[in-house]
Amino acid sequence: MDENQPSLKDDILKGIDAIAEFIGEDFWRTQRLCTKKAIPAAKMQGRWIASKRKLRAHYDRLTAGQTT
């Protein structure tokens, strides 16, 4: 395993609550984003999971070139 990458258990968020907290959204909005595949998440055995690394890359792409 690459020393710069976190272990899988440290990278994976399990459940809408954990994903919502990580991206700074509420439960219902996060569930909608997952269901509509607006963020990189998948359902595994009935539970939503997402990679912190992939979520961060997704939001980096969305905000690339934007200034405040």
Predicted regions and their residues:
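Short helix-start
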Residues: G15-D17, P40-A64
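Short intrinsically disordered terminal tails
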Residues: M1-E3, A64-T68
